[in-house]
Each structure stands twice: as structure tokens, then as C-alpha cells.
Amino acid sequence: AARAVFGLARTGSSYSNGSGDFAIAFSTAKELRVTHGATTITPRPALPTEAVSPLFEAVLEATEEAVINSLLKAETTTGNGRTVQALDIEKLREILKKYGR
């Protein structure tokens, strides 16, 4: 989860005090569940060192993809006396093409 903010940065996000950017990570894997009230230490498997960097890269890519998907699927929204228009996907394509993206 700590690496997800780097994926946000790839999309142009900036950070400031109170910006509210955070990431949460959890597992639903049955074999990793901890019994409530457990008092014993249970050893957990660890990734080999050479697998950590590819995992971090996957986190960045997944976060970046999630941001892009949310921008492209957003709808025009009105609230608090303001209206924010949804992105025009065709116009975005033209801009991206213009800049070789």
C-alpha cells in the first residue's frame, strides 16, 4: 500500500497537507487469517528479494490504471452549487495523439 502513492504520482497527482491521499491493502487469503484473540506468533511466508521489485512495479501499474479508469468512466456531477463535466474521451484521444501518447 505504501507504494500506491507513486502510482498516483505517475498520473500527475500532487500532494499537499490535507490532500487526503491514502491507500489500504488487505488480503482475503484464508491461509493468512489470524484468529481473534490469538496469543501465539505465527510465521508467515516472505517473498524472495528478487520478487519484491516486480511486485512494487505491479502496484504502481495497478494504481495508475485505476486512476485512469476512474477518470474515463466518471460522469458529469453537480453538487454544492457546482457542476463538473465528465471528460470528453474523444477530445482526450485527440490531445494524446497530438503529443504522441
Where is each model-derived feature located?
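A structural signal for small-residue-enriched, beta-sheet-centric alpha/beta enzyme cores
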Residues: 1-101
